């Protein structure tokens, strides 16, 4: 099927494009991206039989890519399935997501990787790129078979949800990953220092009678992994950056030429620890929401390029796992359907330009993962069309996700994906 997207503002930072243009899609790929598609050799009669999208007043951008999503399947289908997670992703404008390996069983082998890929194919929505486990069973004791995982379709490895505590094992993991050209996505947390903590350490935690988690829990491991990255030359990606100290360490490492990249999530540049006031478990996550100083450091890191990508860390949980005492409530929030609207606030507030935001949500994730970049002719037609002026209210009961654990319910946001096109197929509108 041919699709003609006409009259939209095409923003493709990878190819230096920011102009009103038409895009023609044929056989799942970008055939033409020009100001005057209708004047090329394609006949008007054939174009008239195509599906046509009037994108006037809309933004047409390379498909958004979320490098950090928990789809929960296999094992926790009551929280999310690959089908529902992909539906949520498509609704949020994401043409591709990376599925973290902390499933049950853990994705540490070919069979689980192929299961995830087959389920994603059956869903027929956003692309799913499985992330394999650094260690067998996320145990931190024995490395997974990286060659087998890569051959099955894994692009990166991670023990996300848990840190790799053993420095010797992490060094071996980096050396092994480098040999197979796999990205390591590191969950940076010192569990001994974090023991018992449920929110950011500080005056608010003291007043609430809760055990705090100091910033050093994250930054200590960030600095360790940067040192191992410099030692091994492996590609390292720091997950869910939340502290000023981590931003500073990553910035300095990049100046030294270290092959490290980093991500953060909208909750870390939008909220602070104040969101847990009243023991709001929908604002409980790991890493926890931090101080205003940390939030500002995250914004500065996004602005100066220290932080490469915006992800969701989409972590679905049932209401029973959230509607309980703060100490025992599950960590994590969902974000696939709110991320774009929250991230566009950075443009509205002058923190990022629109082009830079698209880099953080599409171009940079593609580059880090080794995927096709931008809307170049011949690339897969993975495209997100955004209405930047659409004002909408977050209503969790309308989410495509099976879960409702968001601290943003009731928020008014501006900007929303109106079409998500994956491989030339319209997945949502």
Annotate each PLM feature.
Residues 44, 48-60:
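Active-site metal-binding motif and surrounding structural segment of the metallo-beta-lactamase
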Residues 207-235, 282, 303-304, 308-310, ...:
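His/Asp/Glu-enriched, well-ordered alpha-helical/loop segment
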Residues 1-41:
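N-terminal metal-binding scaffold of metallo-dependent hydrolase/deaminase domains
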Residues 55-120:
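Metal-associated gating/positioning segment near the N- to mid-region
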Residues 110-127, 175-186, 342:
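Alpha-helix-loop-beta-strand connector modules within alpha/beta enzyme cores
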Residues 141-310:
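Histidine/acidic residue-rich metal-binding segments in metalloenzymes
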Residues 8, 23, 28, 57, ...:
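Divalent metal-coordination and catalytic microenvironments
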